[in-house]
Amino acid sequence: MIGKLKGIVDSYGEDFVILDVNGVGYVVHCSARTLQRLPKPGEATDLAIETHVREDMIRLYGFRVDAEREWFRLLQTVQGVGTRVALGVLSVLEPAQLATAIATGDKGAVARAPGVGPRLAARLVAELKDKAPAFAPIDPALIALTGAVEDRTAPQPVADAISALVNLGYAQIQASAAIAAALKGLGEEAGTVEAKTLIRLGLRELAR
């Protein structure tokens, strides 16, 4: 079994990278998010590998961090989730974002993944909710903020800022996480901050 590959990026396909390791080109399937973050052809990189062996083929899946590989495995424990859907989920949500989305019951964030409808998103959240904290620490402030937004008890500037980021195309969990980080950075000033300032700070968090 192959657990890690280190080599030179040869070329890219729609959902894979060919990694040249000592003259041998390995086809490694990756999430869209991982492919976007790999270097250009001719540069070195390394990937954690999940190897799937079947009677007629051996397929390699690559990940930049071990947490992504662990989520890839965990997602497939849910009925209806195969490798393609698991990579789709990891294409729209980083491991920490996925853990938070599941822990907070944000089915909408999970449903943004290709191949994941509302019913499958609900099943993923329900079956993995108790396991999510073991894969990434969940920020209590983010959970509280998410609950306040859902209950419509969040301060208006906070709700407006999150809504603005969602309207810009970000997932609800991404917007909430960015605003939660911005509020934490503001400290005592968080109680008087305006929505436009939160939006600017939230976009800065999302750009990191």
UniProtKB/Swiss-Prot annotation:
It holds the Pfam family RuvA_C. SUPFAM superfamilies: DNA helicase RuvA subunit, C-terminal domain, Nucleic acid-binding proteins, RuvA domain 2-like. Residues 153-208 are annotated as: Domain III. The keyword ATP-binding does not apply. Gene3D superfamilies: 5' to 3' exonuclease, C-terminal subdomain, DNA helicase RuvA subunit, C-terminal domain, Nucleic acid-binding proteins. Residues 144-152 are annotated as: Flexible linker. The keyword DNA-binding applies. Homotetramer. Forms an RuvA(8)-RuvB(12)-Holliday junction (HJ) complex. HJ DNA is sandwiched between 2 RuvA tetramers; dsDNA enters through RuvA and exits via RuvB. An RuvB hexamer assembles on each DNA strand where it exits the tetramer. Each RuvB hexamer is contacted by two RuvA subunits (via domain III) on 2 adjacent RuvB subunits; this complex drives branch migration. In the full resolvosome a probable DNA-RuvA(4)-RuvB(12)-RuvC(2) complex forms which resolves the HJ. Belongs to the RuvA family. This is Holliday junction branch migration complex subunit RuvA. The gene is ruvA.
